[in-house]
Regions:
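Hydrophobic/aromatic beta-strand patches that form the interior of the parallel beta-sheet core
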Residues: 60-62, 102, 128-130, 188-192
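Acidic/histidine-rich catalytic neighborhood of metal-dependent amide-processing enzymes
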Residues: 45, 69-157, 164-175, 179-181
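His/Asp/Glu-rich mid-to-C-terminal helical/loop segments that flank catalytic regions of hydrolases
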Residues: 201-276
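A non-catalytic alpha/beta surface segment that caps or lines the substrate-entry region
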Residues: 1-54
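Glycine/charged-rich beta-loop-alpha catalytic/anionic-binding loops adjacent to active sites
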Residues: 58, 62-70
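Solvent-exposed, acidic/flexible segments
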Residues: 10-17, 74-78, 246-250
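Short, well-structured beta-strand/strand-turn elements
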Residues: 28-38, 186-197
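Glycine-rich beta-alpha junction loops
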Residues: 133-136, 194-199
């Protein structure tokens, strides 16, 4: 799964963008691009890479951003997640299971790529969204659903026993990512990250502060964020390098996603006053 990690951890944003296109081509994954011209707000423009199923069958959308903050390798944020989704896309294609994939530009500059997609998304064909961000370091899958955990398309990924099997936990806060673009558009979404187990308690503490509501934080909130081990893997932290990416963490997420897709839908039990 780490096969393409080295190819994707490029600091130059234009080369990074082209590297993703090259990897998708090498893997035989046909894609289309969704773009927005350069502007004062987005000087490099926006380029999303989209993988669509062969039919218009309603399906899940799996997404991750491929851009990185200036000067960062962007290994955990977010090349690891890209590698996971590329492998998942290939597997589902071979199994003839319909699914949509989007590799978004501009997450680090205000979610410009996912906003572009969400505004133009056909809600009749996207049943739900699972967004991956920070999936290459840690041992515990953290899932933030903002109340979408019981939505039909997303419920298979949120069951108690299923989460226990994959060492996952539902949390009430994760840092805002591309999932927010879909929440604002009324499309149910989950956001997923992998963190060290001891970081879960910090996420719970951050949730008690109401997250960074409206983009505003307090000194206490920022202090908690900087105490988290996962923070060291992003934005120039001392673990913001490819050698810290853990293949076990990536496989954990991949196995969780694949099994969630393959799970048969839950059968709702009913009660009838009249039995034949």
């Amino acid at each position: 799964m780490q096969t393409h990690l080295e190819a994707l951890i490029i600091k130059d944003p234009d080369e990074r963008r082209q590297a993703l296109a090259d990897v998708l081509h090498a893997e035989g994954l046909c894609y289309t691009t969704q773009s927005e011209e350069p502007s004062i707000k987005y000087p490099r423009g926006v380029v999303n890479y989209l993988l669509e199923p062969d039919t218009d069958t309603p399906s899940l959308l799996f997404c991750a951003h491929y851009d990185a903050v200036p000067g960062s390798f962007g290994a955990n944020d977010n090349a690891a997640a890209i590698c996971i989704l590329i492998k998942l896309a290939k597997e589902l294609k071979e199994r003839h299971i319909p699914a949509r994939f989007a590799f978004f530009d501009g997450e680090e500059t205000g979610n410009s790529g996912s906003k572009l997609y969400a505004v133009n998304a056909d809600r009749d064909t996207v049943t739900g969204v699972i967004n991956l961000d920070l999936c290459g370091y840690g041992d515990t899958i953290a899932i933030y659903g903002k109340g979408n955990e019981k939505k039909t398309a997303l419920a298979p990924f949120c069951g108690k026993s299923f989460l226990k099997k994959h060492n996952g936990q539902l949390v009430k806060y994760l840092p805002p990512s591309d999932d927010t673009s879909f929440s604002q558009s009324g499309i149910p979404a989950l956001s997923l990250a992998v963190v060290p187990a001891w970081d879960i308690k910090f996420l719970k503490a951050l949730a008690s502060y109401g997250g960074n509501l409206f983009g505003h934080t307090t000194p206490e909130f920022d202090m908690i964020v900087h105490q988290m081990e996962i923070t060291s893997t992003i934005h120039g932290g001392h673990r913001d390098a490819p050698e810290w990416i853990d293949s076990k963490a990536m496989k954990q997420v991949y196995d969780y996603l694949l099994e969630g897709i393959l799970k048969p839908p839950a059968v709702k039990s009913g009660f009838s006053l009249f039995k034949k």
